Swiss-Prot record:
Role, per record: The alpha subunit is responsible for the aldol cleavage of indoleglycerol phosphate to indole and glyceraldehyde 3-phosphate.
Subunit structure: Tetramer of two alpha and two beta chains.
Organism for this UniProt entry: Methylobacterium radiotolerans (strain ATCC 27329 / DSM 1819 / JCM 2831 / NBRC 15690 / NCIMB 10815 / 0-1)
E.C. designation(s): 4.2.1.20
Family: Belongs to the TrpA family.
Protein name according to UniProt: Tryptophan synthase alpha chain
CC annotations in GO: cytosol
Keywords carried by this UniProt record: Amino-acid biosynthesis, Aromatic amino acid biosynthesis, Lyase, Tryptophan biosynthesis
Active-site feature positions: E50 (proton acceptor), D61 (proton acceptor)
GO molecular function, one term: tryptophan synthase activity
EC category: lyase
Catalytic activity: (1S,2R)-1-C-(indol-3-yl)glycerol 3-phosphate + L-serine = D-glyceraldehyde 3-phosphate + L-tryptophan + H2O
Pathway: Amino-acid biosynthesis; L-tryptophan biosynthesis; L-tryptophan from chorismate: step 5/5
Pfam families from the UniProt entry: Trp_syntA (PF00290)
Organism taxonomic ancestry: Bacteria, Pseudomonadati, Pseudomonadota, Alphaproteobacteria, Hyphomicrobiales
Length: 279
């Protein structure tokens, strides 16, 4: 039986389109609101859900996601709380893939074996751990693969031909190409260079290649979808949520809708672009 991730990409290929991968922070602005956002994303057009694990020192993240993590931590969100939200999401949705994205420290503190067992039990499909290089695969990557969790690796504009095979060696699910050197949400990618980079990665792997960092609009999503298997959007969704909060950072009646409205625009852009990889 194919994994949820594999089935999602296969379904998108059958529909001649790329997938939309959305990122939101677990616990932002509070656990219950983040769960409501998570539940609403598939209906708005999200194909794969990245759910951020809040951490006090998110070195790869820009101001928007850093602030989201701090709001989540202030609201009391934890690794255990994040897994509980995934478990509750799974009670009503058994088909949409959920990928946890974050840093190794909270997982290590929780306990690797305990974390992997609890993640599988909750219904997590994969992990993106941005600060674990391939040289440390024995720490988490290989144990995760052994539990049936996809371990999704990042490739960047500075990942050269010598480095790329090591990055891809134990990658599963899909490859996440970071289209901009630096932190999230701070610039707009050069779409021509992105297509060239995706083509280069595809020469080394049959895994789907998704592209993120700097995607803010439906037009951006459409431009990237033309040359990639998927488009990732995170900071723009976090910003949409923040703009909907009141002056004290509390959610309003339209907070979930503020996120899903943008997701619908992004999904329309992705779907308008046609297939990202020839069948």
């Amino acid at each position: 039986m194919p994994s949820r991730i594999d089935a999602t990409f296969a379904r998108a290929r059958a529909e001649n389109r790329s997938v939309l991968v959305t990122y939101v922070m677990s616990g932002d602005p509070d656990p219950e609101t983040s769960l409501e956002v998570l539940k609403a994303l598939p209906g708005a057009g999200a194909d794969i859900l990245e759910f951020g694990l809040p951490f006090t020192d998110p070195m790869a993240d820009g101001p928007a996601i850093q602030a989201a993590g701090l709001r989540a931590l202030k609201a009391g969100q934890t690794v255990s709380g994040t897994l509980d939200l995934v478990r509750r999401f799974r009670a009503g949705n058994d088909t949409t893939p959920v990928v946890l994205m974050g840093y190794y420290n909270p997982i290590h503190t929780y306990g690797v074996d305990r974390f992997l067992d609890d993640a599988v039990a909750a219904g997590v499909d994969g992990l993106i751990v941005v600060d674990l290089p391939p040289e440390e695969d024995a720490e988490l990557c290989l144990p995760a693969l052994g539990k049936g969790l996809a371990f999704i690796r990042l490739a960047t504009p500075t990942t050269d031909e010598r480095r790329l095979p090591a990055v891809l060696a134990n990658t599963a699910g899909f490859v996440y190409y970071v289209s901009i050197t630096g932190i999230t949400g701070t610039a707009t990618p050069d779409f021509g260079k992105v297509s060239e980079a995706v083509a280069r990665i595809r020469r080394h792997t049959d895994l789907p290649v998704v592209v993120g960092f700097g995607v803010k609009t439906g037009a951006h999503a459409a431009a990237i979808a033309k040359g990639a298997d998927g488009v990732v959007v995170g900071s723009a969704l976090v910003d949409a949520l923040v703009r909907s909060l009141d002056g004290e950072g509390r959610p309003q009646a339209g907070s979930v809708g503020a996120v899903t409205e943008l997701v619908r625009e992004l999904a329309a852009g992705v779907r308008s672009a046609g297939v990202g990889r020839a069948a």
